């Protein structure tokens, strides 16, 4: 085995891309800060009980597991930061009102995930705890849209659904977990024939409603159709009212909102509105999120919660190559005036690379497009000839 090889779907981030990732990470955290979201840095590793309990089987499978050499207990390397922020809100901060948290950190997954098909995505996200109303769902989605605009994505499509509709339809259906999973899979693939076949033993009205979910997709007008075709229960009608409020709450933004009532991503994890952001020319969701009101229960407090996250490395790898800004080359001369100019330029945010003895043959590798030269006794910056 060659010592420089990395595991599959694990890779280095080289200087140009790393600089862009870090610049955007800072910009996103600054965006979250001015919206009142407090930055937290959860640990890379925790006991498995806190990382995956209450989140569902999928996250357990995605988590790398190790044995703690100090205690002998099973630990996991985080595959998702959301459960960690839920723990911080419920157990560490213990606020009674609304808490807004944000984060930016790498996660490790057993299988590749996200736009870049990486097992080590860089998750950046925001979570809002302590408010159950649709207003907080709207706030989080608006923040997600601003975040994607910040990284340079303009033409956005927001796909919105509500897992509570499917859950409400099955609430009194009396079906087993296996049949529920099969219905879920059929709806995800919009296979209406499979839905009807799987639901033969259900109440005819329930089956008709489940089948209609595969057709209820489109702009905000589809919610009016849904209100007529779905049962007139308070839970379902309230879910539709909440979705309509989301459409109105995003109406002033330059995005296209689509409602897809068969979209049930995270059904066993989310408890209400779910959403994902797409952009023209990009395969797969750029960011996703939703409401997950029960996750904090395992930590002692089941607080209302909603949030979103994006894989910043994946997003950056999909963006057009950025134009690089060259550095300024400074000769290796012991001159107080030169040192003063170099430090002044650096204080302004300019990149100045001071030459070192013996490096003349390699100056072209520095990427400098300007050079400090002495003219009339003063050091000035001019366009660099071939170094």
UniProtKB/Swiss-Prot annotation:
GO terms for biological process: L-histidine biosynthetic process. Keywords: Amino-acid biosynthesis, Cytoplasm, Histidine biosynthesis. One of its GO terms (cellular component) is cytoplasm. Its main location: cytoplasm. CDD domains: HisRS-like_core. It is found in: Cytoplasm. It comes from the Bacteria. Pathway: Amino-acid biosynthesis; L-histidine biosynthesis; L-histidine from 5-phospho-alpha-D-ribose 1-diphosphate: step 1/9. Required for the first step of histidine biosynthesis. May allow the feedback regulation of ATP phosphoribosyltransferase activity by histidine. Heteromultimer composed of HisG and HisZ subunits. Belongs to the class-II aminoacyl-tRNA synthetase family. HisZ subfamily. This function is generally fulfilled by the C-terminal part of HisG, which is missing in some bacteria such as this one. This is ATP phosphoribosyltransferase regulatory subunit. It comes from Methylobacillus flagellatus (strain ATCC 51484 / DSM 6875 / VKM B-1610 / KT).
């Amino acid at each position: 085995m060659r010592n420089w090889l990395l595991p599959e779907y694990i890779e280095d981030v080289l200087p140009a891309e790393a600089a862009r990732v870090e610049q955007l990470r800072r910009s996103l955290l600054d965006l979250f800060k001015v919206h009142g979201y407090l930055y937290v840095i959860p640990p890379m590793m925790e006991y498995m009980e806190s990382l995956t309990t209450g989140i569902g089987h999928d996250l357990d499978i995605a988590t790398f597991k190790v044995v703690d050499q100090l205690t002998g207990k099973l630990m996991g390397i985080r595959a998702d930061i959301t459960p960690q922020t839920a723990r911080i809100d419920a157990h560490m901060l213990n606020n009674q009102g609304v808490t807004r948290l944000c984060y930016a950190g790498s996660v490790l997954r057993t299988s590749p995930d996200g736009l870049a098909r990486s097992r080590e995505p860089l998750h950046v996200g925001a979570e809002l705890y302590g408010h159950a109303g649709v207003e907080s769902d709207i706030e989080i989605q608006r923040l997600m849209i601003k975040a994607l605009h910040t990284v340079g994505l303009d033409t956005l499509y927001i796909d919105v659904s509500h897992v509570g509709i499917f859950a409400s339809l099955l609430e009194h259906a009396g079906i087993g977990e296996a049949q529920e999973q099969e219905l879920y899979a059929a709806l995800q693939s919009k296979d209406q024939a499979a839905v009807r076949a799987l639901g033969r033993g259900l109440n005819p009205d329930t089956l008709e409603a489940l089948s209609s979910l595969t057709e209820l997709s489109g702009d905000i007008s589809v919610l009016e159709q849904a209100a007529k075709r779905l049962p007139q229960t308070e839970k379902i009608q309230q879910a539709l009212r909440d979705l309509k409020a989301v459409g109105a709450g995003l109406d002033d933004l330059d995005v296209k909102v689509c409602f897809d009532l068969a979209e049930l991503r995270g059904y066993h994890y989310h408890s209400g509105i779910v959403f994902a952001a797409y952009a023209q020319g990009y395969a797969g969701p750029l960011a996703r999120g939703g409401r997950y009101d029960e996750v904090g229960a395992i930590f002692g407090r089941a607080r209302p919660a909603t949030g979103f996250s994006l894989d910043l490395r994946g997003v950056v790898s999909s963006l057009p190559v950025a134009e690089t800004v060259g550095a300024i080359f400074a000769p290796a001369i012991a001159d107080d005036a030169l040192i003063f100019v170099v430090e002044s330029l650096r204080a302004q945010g300019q990149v100045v690379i001071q030459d070192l003895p013996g490096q003349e043959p390699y100056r072209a590798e520095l990427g400098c497009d300007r050079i400090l030269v002495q003219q009339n006794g003063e050091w000035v910056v001019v366009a660099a000839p071939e170094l």
